[in-house]
């Protein structure tokens, strides 16, 4: 095989396996829902469909996960909540840290003071509308750089429209650099606007907020 033929063969094998996994998950979820329906348990069950991360399928020249671009950064989250009319869409910024407080809230158990995250129940009960004091930013940090995947260490923050990513290497082998994206104008994150004058105020604001969140979370490495 030529290098091009080998690359094509690997890609086709990869896509086929990926689609097989998707079908298997779909079938398994269907079996669970059928069981709940058959045993009259739907009205007494909270159903949560989610994942630990998204996945790259060649976007940004990447596969797998780890980087803070949308394809991996965003995760699916579907919740069926008894008594809710359903069909709603929440725009609030949520994360997997919110799952445990949500389950405790549903069970009528108070969240421990040292537990991170917020209950999603208020959002579920108000057709996707978040409380006024809900979080405005999300923080992300990837620090496990290995030769296996060569994903650079980085951290960053995002709101509903903008994202700041800071790449670093504490060994000094790779100069630190930043990326800033306007997700409304560039949802595929193909245009880094970190040096564009029109975004300079926003970049400064996001850098200050990023450092504030690092301090709040006790982040030592960045």
Positions of predicted regions on the chain:
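Long, internal low-complexity/basic segments
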Residues: 1-13, 21, 25, 129, ...
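Active-site rim elements
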Residues: 7-20, 64, 84-94, 106-111, ...
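Beta-strand elements within well-structured catalytic alpha/beta cores of enzymes
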Residues: 18-25, 29, 46-51, 77-79, ...
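Solvent-exposed, polar/charged alpha-helical surfaces in well-ordered, non-transmembrane soluble domains
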Residues: 27-30, 34, 101, 105, ...
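Histidine-centered active-site microenvironments of extracellular/periplasmic hydrolases
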Residues: 34-88, 95, 148
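Short, surface-exposed helix-loop/turn micro-motifs enriched in polar/charged residues
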Residues: 39, 69, 91, 111-113, ...
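C-terminal cap/loop subdomain of S1 sulfatases and analogous C-terminal strand-loop tails that border
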Residues: 53-59, 85, 97-100, 105-179, ...
């Amino acid at each position: 095989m030529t290098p091009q033929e080998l690359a094509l063969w690997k890609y086709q094998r990869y896509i086929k396996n990926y689609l097989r996994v998707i079908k298997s998950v779909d079938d398994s979820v269907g079996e669970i829902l059928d069981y709940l329906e058959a045993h009259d348990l739907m009205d007494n069950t909270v159903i949560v469909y989610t994942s630990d991360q998204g996945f790259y399928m060649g976007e940004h020249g990447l596969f797998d996960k780890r980087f803070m671009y949308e394809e991996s950064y965003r995760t699916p989250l579907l919740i069926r909540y008894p008594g809710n009319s359903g069909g709603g869409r929440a725009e609030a910024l949520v994360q997997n840290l919110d799952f445990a407080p949500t389950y405790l809230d549903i069970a009528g158990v108070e969240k421990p003071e040292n537990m991170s995250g917020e209950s999603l129940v208020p959002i579920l009960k108000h057709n996707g509308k978040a409380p006024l004091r809900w979080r405005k930013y999300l923080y992300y940090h990837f620090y496990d750089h290995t030769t296996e995947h060569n994903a650079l260490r980085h951290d960053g923050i995002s709101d509903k429209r903008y994202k700041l990513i800071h790449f670093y290497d504490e060994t000094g082998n790779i100069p630190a650099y930043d990326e800033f994206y306007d997700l409304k104008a560039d949802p595929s994150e193909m245009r880094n606007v970190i040096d564009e004058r029109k975004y300079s105020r926003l970049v400064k604001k996001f850098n200050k907020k990023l450092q504030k969140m690092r301090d709040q979370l006790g982040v030592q490495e960045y």
